[in-house]
Design a protein with these regions (language model features):
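Outer membrane beta-barrel transmembrane domains
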Residues: 105-206
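Outer-membrane pore/translocation modules
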Residues: 1-111
Length: 206
């Protein structure tokens, strides 16, 4: 990708990518646990399991920023704090993580990523537990680098408002969904930005 990130490039639907992404493995340890306080620290690694050499419609390696994976091993450090305003019913939390990225074998390095989240959740039912939540999510990343040079149209700052709901369906198992709505987006030069995000998942406590 000799002209990676150059503004003014033209893309078609055939230039999109899809596939299995990178896997993040994070170990967490509770540093402070009490009736109203919880502080957790975490260390982890992002493994290069996702494809990062997919070709575009012209047979060249596609834009790195839309690949399922990055092709690099990256370190992750995280922290989480929760305060129980009304124990087991109403809480507020603050969390942050920082991903330190390395260069892949195509000499491309994604900018280190800072994530900061703050929010609250409220238990609205006890017999069939359901929890509603509201979060503010912030993401910041500097420009990527290719062959040691900064890449145009990469990096930026994003802020999202994220309402969500979680429903316990059995002992230890819950279904959850979140809708991520952008309230501030700043990108360098030109770049793709999402109009919204939808997260649906299942969690289970062992």
């Amino acid at each position: 990708f000799d002209e990676v990130g150059e503004p003014g490039e033209f893309f078609t639907r055939q230039d999109g990518t899809s596939g299995f992404g990178d896997i993040r493995l994070i170990g967490k340890y509770a540093l402070w646990v009490s009736t109203k306080h919880l502080l957790v620290g975490g260390l982890g690694v992002k493994t290069p399991t996702g494809e990062f050499k997919l070709l575009d419609s012209e047979g060249a390696i596609n834009e790195p920023t839309i690949m399922p994976g990055t092709g690099s091993w990256d370190a992750i450090v995280s922290a989480y704090y929760d305060y129980q305003v009304m124990p087991h019913q109403l809480d507020v939390f603050l969390s942050s993580s920082y991903q330190i990225n390395t260069e892949n074998d195509l000499n491309y390095k994604f900018g280190n990523t800072l994530l900061v989240n703050a929010g609250t959740s409220y238990l609205i039912a006890v017999k069939n537990p359901a929890t509603i939540s509201l979060q503010v999510n912030m993401r910041h990343a500097p420009r990527d680098e290719f062959n040691g040079e900064e890449v145009p149209s990469t990096g930026g700052k994003w802020v999202y408002l994220t309402p969500g709901v979680k429903v316990d369906v059995s002992s230890g198992t819950a279904l959850y969904t979140h809708v991520q709505l952008p309230i501030y987006q700043f990108v360098n030069e030109e770049n793709l930005v999402p109009r919204y995000g939808l997260i649906i998942g299942v969690s289970h406590a062992f």
